[in-house]
């Protein structure tokens, strides 16, 4: 019997995050939700990552309300989100009580699969979120942030997979955020994990470097069970490979695929119009759809590269880009080879720019790099360069154990602080994650409600 390969659709989260910086309002995709629900996906990734921040910051949407509406419109498909371990959806570590309540509420509001990762692959930073997911009855997808370095070996990754399984992971995700995993590497890594544990494996990559289609085919050959794809109008470039193309290729190779082609055609026709609107208004820059092989040379993810370019442009120093690109891998090595994913990619990039423009390495460092060297972000894959660490920290003490253990509970004090303002625990969680954004959102919501009531009284 043919082996089945399942699909996760990313258009509602990572595809639009990668191509249009997550600026996809709910009303733009709402008409398609019941159609997506009929397509036959393993799951639809629709929440987490940058969506929470962007809903509040730019779209004036309640992210919790968005999740509830998606759930109501898609009763037959698993909903999936991306969670940054102890960072949840923010950029620094939070206390355990916040992590636990956030996961509990995400599941209560409709989440089925929580993909949990840590920027350093430090499982200590994933443990609380993993346990909370299992306790809430959802699927915990333990995630490896894929990267290459002298210390990132298959043996190391397999060891991590075994730890994640012990923590309660039901599936394992290999997350190649930079799109640098080649076909042979995918085959070897999936084979190594499959030999070690009997669990479904999901591979997530990006088309940035042009490798993704080939990488998926070899991964499937090695036994990968699930792949992440984007409906064709939102595929390619910094996004994922096209759903329809992968389904076609896999069927031709003799694999079973559950997707309904008639439904994916309907999705494609609809999202073409949405994509064209974003191209017309300049939100979708054609360059995001292009292939960029520089990542293979410098091992710098595409999103990080564009950030470096915009930073240098603002400083009138775009002519120093080549120096910064050569400095970035050196800073990464100094910092113990962290995977270049949020938030470590930003920290390493900013430090590389600073080193080049200051004309002296580590003359000036960000507070994030200082916190990183103190151990606040967790255990680094390799030790940080001792000489540089001493220069940065001076007499400052390093964190022992897990940084979150030093943080005081935050939920109860925030509930008290927001009495009369927060309508629910979801509001409390939004405020803890992004206080300024949530405060503004609550004010706007209140004003809207008051105007609405005033209007209806006049009407009556």
Enumerate the predicted regions with their spans.
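Terminal or standalone catalytic/regulatory effector modules within metabolic enzymes
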Residues: 31, 37-55, 285-295, 299-460
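Glycine-rich phosphate-binding active-site loops on the catalytic face of alpha/beta enzymes
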Residues: 116, 176, 222-239
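C-terminal helical cap(s) of enzyme catalytic domains, especially alpha/beta-barrels
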Residues: 235-257
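Catalytic cores of alpha/beta
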Residues: 152-164, 209-225
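Conserved, mostly hydrophobic/aromatic
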Residues: 7, 15, 36, 116, ...
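Active-site beta->alpha loop and helix N-cap motifs at the rims of alpha/beta catalytic domains
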Residues: 48-165, 172, 179-183
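N-terminal amphipathic alpha-helix/helix-capping segment at the start of soluble metabolic enzymes
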Residues: 1-20, 67, 72
